[in-house]
Amino acid sequence: MALRLDDKKAVVAEVAAVAARAHSAVAAEYRGLSVSALTQLRKEARESGVYLRVVKNTLARKAVEGTGFECMQDGLVGPLILAFSLEDPGSAARVVSAFAKTNDKLVVKLVAVGGKQYGPSELERLASLPNREQAISMLMGTMKAPIEKFVRTLAEPHAKFVRTLAAVRDQKQAA
């Protein structure tokens, strides 16, 4: 079904708005995937806060123009599905990577983060990035560790004294 000019402008505007606020993007070839598989991929993407859309390549090129994903323009060839991470940089990569493990017909072609394009080999690296909550908990653990060690160091002489008294008491009771 051919799109009218107004529809094309609306698609370009929608994808451009999403691309402008996205952290990262993944373009994958979906040739040979069944409708049910694509529906499952869309469901997983929705649950993860990932914008997933099949867009004509010419419209996608116009949509990413002037955004941080302009670097992807040359690689937008063939039947591609675009995934944009809206919540954290690795969410689109996690969704596409997990789905590609079970469906070999979904082939990652491009990965873009921070205005730079990477090859498909970088998908796993991006997918392994922690999300916001995980990053905060890792940071808090790192910040908390020196304080805990300091408190244990301060408490150790008192604990050692108590253990010594207990050993003397046990020795006297045994005698």
Swiss-Prot record:
Entry GO CC: large ribosomal subunit
Presence of keyword Ribosomal protein: yes
Keywords for the protein's UniProt record, in alphabetical order: Ribonucleoprotein, Ribosomal protein, RNA-binding, rRNA-binding
Gene (UniProt): rplJ
UniProt xrefs under Pfam families: Ribosomal_L10
HAMAP family listed in its UniProt record: Ribosomal_uL10
Gene3D superfamilies from the UniProt entry: 3.30.70.1730, 6.10.250.2350
Name listed for the protein in its UniProt record: Large ribosomal subunit protein uL10
Role this protein plays: Forms part of the ribosomal stalk, playing a central role in the interaction of the ribosome with GTP-bound translation factors.
Subunit composition and interactions: Part of the ribosomal stalk of the 50S ribosomal subunit. The N-terminus interacts with L11 and the large rRNA to form the base of the stalk. The C-terminus forms an elongated spine to which L12 dimers bind in a sequential fashion forming a multimeric L10(L12)X complex.
GO biological process: translation
Entry-linked CDD domains: Ribosomal_L10 (cd05797)
Gene Ontology molecular function, alphabetical: large ribosomal subunit rRNA binding; structural constituent of ribosome
Coiled-coil segments: none
UniProt KW Cell division keyword: no
Family statement: Belongs to the universal ribosomal protein uL10 family.
